[in-house]
Amino acid sequence: MTSAEDRRLIARWSHRFGFGPKPGQFRALVDSGIDRAFNSLIDTTPSLFDIQLINELLSIKDLGDQPRSNTPQIVPYANEKRRQIRALTLWWISVMCSTDNPLSERMTWFWHGHWATSFQKVDEPLLISMQNFTLRRNALGNFRQMCKEMVVDPALVYWLDAQSSTAKSPNENLARELMELFILGVDRYSEMDVKQAALALTGYRLKKSSGVVTYNAALHYSNPVTILGKTSPLDALSLVDLLVDQDNCLRFVSERLWYRFVSTSAPLPSDNSLKQSFNNRDISSLIKIGRAHV
């Protein structure tokens, strides 16, 4: 018979690693026993969908360039954008409610908040859809791979104005957020690191309506840059490698997941078990160690 403490743990895990149990699920988890319940709730099977199929189903597509505001085409264009983003939002809520992979969906939602982007500025449902599928594909995979895909994610590129950054006029927004919010954390880099990283991120162009990101070598700063004490020529992907290799990346991601899944006030374990489990930057390994703490 499952103890009251085990029932409490299963209930807690259900809400931490998912969105709470579906009808009848809590009883099934309790009946399965504490070990099987935990393994079921931390099932790292990715919540994958065919993006082309879903976009076709929801009629999310490239609408082309925005018509001028004083033309009759602007109203149906704006209405169609609103319809598309509403359809995508309702689809994702439906998936959250019905998924058989709650941890994967919860982690997709977690990374959606981590890589903060908003439709209010991006204003292209297709780009938001593309980002959602990038996040769910990498939600429980390798953090390095996620960062490499996200640094050239069209919604993030536009959100942080990276599409206009050139060697002669570098934009620091993506460089700063990449270090502060996405990979290293606050006060773990210098202002000179930001300026140099901004140079590494130059030369990327975006076709906004389609989400196609391209690289123009003529607009990229090709000379060596010095970031976190290391000097070499860098582009977006090699910059990600440099940042993800830092001990502060290991520390930052461990902190972020600890605060989301365990406690906003309790410190990380002093035995460094969380950080050690993330040595290879595998997100699922970091999640699986959570049983001892959640």
Where is each model-derived feature located?
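Cell-wall polysaccharide-cleaving catalytic domain and substrate-binding groove, primarily
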Residues: 2-52, 152-156, 164-165, 177-180, ...
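Generic detector of short, locally flexible boundary/turn motifs and exposed helical patches
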Residues: 3-5, 69-78, 110-112, 143, ...
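N-terminal accessory alpha/beta regions
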Residues: 23-138
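Active-site substrate-binding loop specific to GH73 endo-beta-N-acetylglucosaminidase modules
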Residues: 88-92, 124-291
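Structural motif
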Residues: 1-9, 83, 98-103, 189, ...
